[in-house]
Amino acid sequence: MMEILRGSPALSAFRINKLLARFQAARLLVHTIYAEYVHFADLNAPLNDDEHAQLERLLKYGPALASHAPQGKLLLVTPRPGTISPWSSKATDIAHNCGLQQVNRLERGVAYYIEAGTLTNEQWQQVTAELHDRMMETVFFALDDAEQLFAHHQPTPVTSVDLLGQGRQALIDANLRLGLALAEDEIDYLQDAFTRLGRNPNDIELYMFAQANSEHCRHKIFNADWVIDGEQQPKSLFKMIKNTFETTPDHVLSAYKDNAAVMEGSEVGRYFADHETGRYDFHQEPAHILMKVETHNHPTAISPWPGAATGSGGEIRDEGATGRGAKPKAGLVGFSVSNLRIPGFEQPWEEDFGKPERIVTALDIMTEGPLGGAAFNNEFGRPALNGYFRTYEEKVNSHNGEELRGYHKPIMLAGGIGNIRADHVQKGEINVGAKLVVLGGPAMNIGLGGGAASSMASGQSDADLDFASVQRDNPEMERRCQEVIDRCWQLGDANPILFIHDVGAGGLSNAMPELVSDGGRGGKFELRDILSDEPGMSPLEIWCNESQERYVLAVAADQLPLFDELCKRERAPYAVIGEATEELHLSLHDRHFDNQPIDLPLDVLLGKTPKMTRDVQTLKAKGDALAREGITIADAVKRVLHLPTVAEKTFLVTIGDRSVTGMVARDQMVGPWQVPVANCAVTTASLDSYYGEAMAIGERAPVALLDFAASARLAVGEALTNIAATQIGDIKRIKLSANWMAAAGHPGEDAGLYEAVKAVGEELCPALGLTIPVGKDSMSMKTRWQEGNEEREMTSPLSLVISAFARVEDVRHTITPQLSTEDNALLLIDLGKGNNALGATALAQVYRQLGDKPADVRDVAQLKGFYDAIQALVAQRKLLAYHDRSDGGLLVTLAEMAFAGHCGIDADIATLGDDRLAALFNEELGAVIQVRAADREAVEAVLAQHGLADCVHYVGQAVSGDRFVITANGQTVFSESRTTLRVWWAETTWQMQRLRDNPECADQEHQAKSNDADPGLNVKLSFDINEDVAAPFIATGARPKVAVLREQGVNSHVEMAAAFHRAGFDAIDVHMSDLLAGRTGLEGFHVLVACGGFSYGDVLGAGEGWAKSILFNDRVRDEFATFFHRPQTLALGVCNGCQMMSNLRELIPGSELWPRFVRNTSDRFEARFSLVEVTQSPSLLLQGMVGSQMPIAVSHGEGRVEVRDAAHLAALESKGLVALRYVDNFGKVTETYPANPNGSPNGITAVTTESGRVTIMMPHPERVFRTVSNSWHPENWGEDGPWMRIFRNARKQLG
């Protein structure tokens, strides 16, 4: 039976206004829109009155419910029947944890009530199209129609393909029907294999074969034999990549054989809790570094949010499934798309060439995709610290003559680093009889065909199959699985995981055969033991679906009870679905139908399928030199600063958490003005050291339209000039991931790919001492469609994205582009040696040209010398600022440095050649360094020692003020105010934020950027930052216990424990499941801290599901009430913990006036480094800090304080319960965005109780307790940041 329960309003006023404006633009007479959430409960038994009241209370979250009966035509948008939304999975979990076992499933829709003039059926279809994502949602016209969401179908049996009766044609038909993308020789191979077995294949076997042997999974092109211009080539592409490892194996521990590569890290204190006692402590051991970069291009073109989200999620799983289990740490993300054509902000180079119906626009991808990727990383608890963004779409005369080149099939890049224990780097052995386990969520009928689908050019497969390729994301589930993996590797030698792989393309049909085959075993499986939420799925759908957030593991049979215990504690679902066999055979039994859908020798599936040969021709580009007529430097500057590749990326940065883990030493945002221009990302290796890891990206795809090899060399060169900004040491410490994107089969591109791989793998990397131990290829970068009567194709340029990773010697020595105005000199190191080529530059692109000669690596020895010289200068602390030259050239390098330093530039380019345009806009490799004037001679001497004397040019100095002036020989070449340039550079991000977020907030942020008087972030402390007020109490040896409380989805508990640990506490890991099961109580604790993250993915209001699981459980409710009423206890709630505790007001004495915390005014997750002021309040944790003003990490989507009315706010203020407020850079309490990131009245962001014993706050002091983890800080701070005082105050209070 289904019950319907009304929910809160679903859209804010500005969202409704945006919809109305869109309808108006489409000439649809829509007058009013009201939207509210509607909940549907599928019940297995009726609820009594108390249970019904409990369910109603559970589903009461967010803004107050509307009291009126909605008017207008109903359009009900729900998830597509046959799918289960991530919201449903998490909300159902909460209902069960609150004791409502009668609820089979909760689901949520949005009911739109629309009052409109007379609309035709076709116009109503336009209206419904605007209101839902056809790939993931459906529209009903009555609330009762939602019954279809819970319809169950009978299981269907496996289907056989009549090969023996119909011969080869049966396989050809199945290939088309199932979208298998099998090549002719593979069809021959299967015909031969099954004829020899003497039986017909089942559909599931063919599907499994297609997934396991797709280009996506088998990399046939990279392993192929090559004939170019009639000449047999000596090596495959993959062999040339492996050559880098053969020449430079230094520091690599694992390459080419696992889900990620591993290199040597540093010996540090890894901080985690003991399995038996729950007590956190440091464990001195090597933290080796793993690295992986994936792409998720096809799903992102179809449905950008889930496409990018599952792209990030899959890459995170690759890291966790490395060796015998590892810890993902920090992420990077990247996008290449066609032109944005932002409405009202179209640029002169952006022509509309049309697109296929089945894919979305570049603007849609960049509106939704980055949000999906960021949301997954945020909810999982991984900071996203690095990225790139390129737009390209043009009709150009390239290798194949004049044609359309661009990214209708986008690149969505997801990568990152993690850490792994030394003894877990290599996978273990799978014993015969080992249990084969699926860890993670249930099978669902989604993402079918992803591996094969992404191996086809968009437009080759059936549109319905594209629907089937869409996936769905549940990062909170992945976090639970990762917590299990963490518990396993933390056990050291007792780790129950023998072998682990993630489940990705092809689902279990790819993952399980890979697992047993890699372990040298076969496997026998039971289909019906696989967890499934949809009983009507066929065997093919159960075995081959790509439901995300799953891992496959081999666990020794005697270790299963331990593994079961770990999973139950973390509430991570798992199922034992088979066991390893001696015989290399794969069998899958179906208990329901008592048959064998799969019964195959492993070598049929994974054996020597036919090897591909690529017989291709070389084509050379004949570009025309750049036509200069009508190009002025002033116009060029504005155009180039508007090009999204160059323009400010704030809209892509502040949506992503950049402080979680407490180990982020360098994020994108630089300096007191928080400008997104960092050269590279840097993390600390642990919470107790200055060793670290660095990541940087290099990418110059448009150059490939002129010169394939140069484009590849420049990608490596740019990654190197980016990562050089931190202290690494020997270049052999740097390892690269190479991600290759090409339109295989397009004239000239295959030979170009070979040329590019050879340039990097056989020549450049070996010469530099660089290794490429990991990478990926995507070989179908083309879209085809019909535009009117014309057949069109959009082919991406050959695109190599290089991600560089390295161990860092001292994270404190990372140099940023932030200029200083002390007596200084700016030096350009021009590795282009005066070539100043303008082919395929940003300048060429904004004038709709390609040019003829591009930049290149001009001298490999000098590139190596450059890296070594910069490393020497970093170690000697001779550099004040550093920024590489890249897209937009020297002009953009100097501008970005000036933006970061909020200063002027007085530059002279006389020594850079007579062609001023080329001097300013060429994109040859190089960098601008800022040094003290007194150090200039010594710095130039170091550069000369490294063979760079002929590359160094003095180009002026940074000056105070707002003028950006470039001269040559006394003549002004360009002059503008820095503020004007800053505003031009920011306009793309402003327009994107206006479209995507609350336009009022976007306008406020843009306005703030034009304020030259803004002093930037600054610090005023009312206490001595270096005084340790806890020291006398620590000296007694007593370590009071703090319960570090977490719920499923919480992700900030480790850094919280570390902060309390440093202040003299014993931090104990306490999971809500421990309290609910009675394994642990709160009576033995002096302090309770509820940590940040996304409990239950924030589905029933941030922190509200967590709070209700306490309030609706009598024993646990009493446990909390007793703790809060006990004198001499302290409690702290941060972020999600703050939201949760604000919902426990009925249990906490003196908290009656506390507000609720609701959706930010921007309607967006906000990750900022915000200035706050400590106000006079009873808070015991903030004693002695009153009046201090200092920055703090902020990361939340629902942090806005909501009070009932003005009287409530006045009472909260007059009682003095406000503990922290947001202030602007002038020190004034503010409600202006983004200084106030959530729109809270009077800047309120922390409150306390009347006794001061319980304090709750939205910002994260635990993420910045170390100076090094602050995005910016005064140079005189030592090891401890000012927020360490909170934790020491806690220790002092307990005496």
From Swiss-Prot:
Predominant subcellular localization, coarse grouping: cytoplasm
Region annotated Disordered, chain positions: 305-327
Enzyme Commission code(s) on record: 6.3.5.3
Active-site residues from the entry: 1135 (nucleophile), 1260, 1262
Binding site for Mg(2+): 718, 722, 884
Positions with a binding annotation for ATP: 307-318, 678, 886
Compartments, record wording: Cytoplasm
Cellular component aspect of the GO annotation: cytoplasm
Protein keywords: ATP-binding, Cytoplasm, Glutamine amidotransferase, Ligase, Magnesium, Metal-binding, Nucleotide-binding, Purine biosynthesis
Primary role: Phosphoribosylformylglycinamidine synthase involved in the purines biosynthetic pathway. Catalyzes the ATP-dependent conversion of formylglycinamide ribonucleotide (FGAR) and glutamine to yield formylglycinamidine ribonucleotide (FGAM) and glutamate.
Family the entry assigns: In the N-terminal section; belongs to the FGAMS family.
Protein name in UniProt: Phosphoribosylformylglycinamidine synthase
Species per Swiss-Prot/TrEMBL record: Escherichia coli (strain UTI89 / UPEC)
